[in-house]
A protein has these predicted regions:
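Non-transmembrane alpha-helical segments in soluble domains
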Residues: 2, 85-89, 157, 175, ...
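Selective for proline/serine-rich intrinsically disordered segments
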Residues: 91, 95-98, 138, 218, ...
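Amphipathic alpha-helical interaction segments
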Residues: 52, 69, 75, 95, ...
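C-terminal helical "tail/cap" subdomain of flavin- and related membrane-associated enzymes
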Residues: 158-275
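A structural signal for well-ordered alpha-helical segments within the folded catalytic domains
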Residues: 82, 151-154, 209
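Conserved FAD-binding catalytic core of PHBH/FMO-like flavoproteins
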Residues: 1-114, 118-123
């Protein structure tokens, strides 16, 4: 469908491949239990590359390598399972004892590409529209690929309801509501790759995250992190971006602190008046 729509003048389409590919490996359960903390996101940051591990219901972990296609530490350099074992021993030594099937997994599992798709228009003539990855494929670094597609469905359903089932009205409205949000989560996912692969190993970055978590605990009505808003709310992605700029979050923290300070002062003032 998208290929046919590309023949329409002005139907812009872009796909950008990340200079990084991926391969999945496994950390199996150990004696029927998780080998790592299942409540944590495990990241092995290595500059422009990384490995992550996410828990599964069977208490194993799926590990994903995000490596460049060529150059040092790339899939082109590390081609076989035996080469992977040597590379892991040097660069991911703590993971090697957790991965008894590393050699076999590395040889068996394919290398995949990561691409961001953007379309300037999603609908045509009030009769056809793109949805999900056809309109806005994104990289997986915010875990929102499927969810953003589900949001398309919810928005299209809402627009059809408001248009009394008139597709010629609903489809342009759906497109208008979703394009900016799709671009926003695509950008946030790409930014999160840099954060995870390059910044997460920095002590300064870890200190910043600790401060953010403290604000979330102490000022829950005023400060919410970007991750929380994206993952655990239905706030539109573009609105999340606006709310989580540094100036906006600084204002939220200031308002929260002012509220915390003012509350006991008002209480003291009230008691003073009563006496």
């Amino acid at each position: 469908v998208r290929s046919r729509l590309l023949s329409i003048p002005g139907f812009d389409f872009r796909q950008d491949y990340l200079d990084c590919q991926y391969k999945e490996l496994t950390i199996p359960a150990r004696d029927g239990e998780f080998a790592l903390d299942p409540e944590a996101l495990h990241i092995w940051p290595r500059g422009g590359s990384m490995m992550i591990a996410l828990p599964n219901p069977d208490r194993s972990f799926t590990c994903t390598l995000f490596w460049p296609p060529t150059g040092p530490g790339s899939f082109d350099e590390v081609r076989t399972g035996e080469q992977a074992l040597a590379y892991f021993t040097a660069h991911y030594p703590d993971a090697v004892p957790l991965m008894p099937d590393l050699v076999a997994d590395y040889d068996a599992n394919p290398v995949g590409s990561l691409v961001t798709v953007r379309c300037g228009r999603w609908s045509a003539n009030g009769r056809v529209a793109l949805i999900g990855d056809a309109a806005h494929a994104i990289t997986p670094f915010f875990g929102q690929g499927a969810n953003s597609g589900f949001e398309d469905v919810a928005e299209l359903d809402r627009c059809l309801g408001e248009a009394d089932g008139d597709w010629s009205v609903a489809l342009p409205a759906y497109e208008k509501a979703r394009v900016d949000n799709a671009n926003a989560i695509a950008d946030m996912a790409l930014a999160n790759f840099v954060e995870m692969s390059t910044k997460s190993g920095s002590r300064v970055f870890q200190a910043q995250k600790s401060v953010q978590h403290a604000f979330e605990r102490l000022l829950p009505e005023h400060y919410v992190s970007r991750y929380e808003l994206v993952s655990f709310s239905t706030i539109p992605y573009a609105e999340v971006v606006r709310r989580t700029t540094v100036p906006s979050q600084a204002r939220s923290v200031a308002a929260g602190i002012a509220h915390r300070v003012a509350a006991p002062l008002r209480s003291l003032s009230g008691r003073g008046g009563a006496s």
